[in-house]
Amino acid sequence: MIHFICALKCEASPLIEHYQLKHIQKAVLFNIYMNNENGVSLTITGVGKLAAAMATTYTYTFLQCEADDVWINMGVAGHATHNIGDIYIANRIEDVSNTSTWY
């Protein structure tokens, strides 16, 4: 299964529409959308690292995910010199709050 994690509804809406995801009413802590036929879920987390971590953990437990499921954290960001509409895939992520780096 593929699980998308998005902070905001405006980031999630195109994916919800494209994958024809339906809101799971029983998921009360976070908004989770799912389509069992195509094996896709999406969780709206709210902004911030802690919210993303809690929502991802909640989704993993609530949906009883498998170890080989795919997780994609997707969102939008702004930048002073990059053009609107440019797409980037992060291959290095730095957390300046604790100097961690992930590849």
Region locations from a protein language model:
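Metabolite-binding pocket within alpha/beta catalytic cores that recognizes anionic/polar moieties
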Residues: 1-103
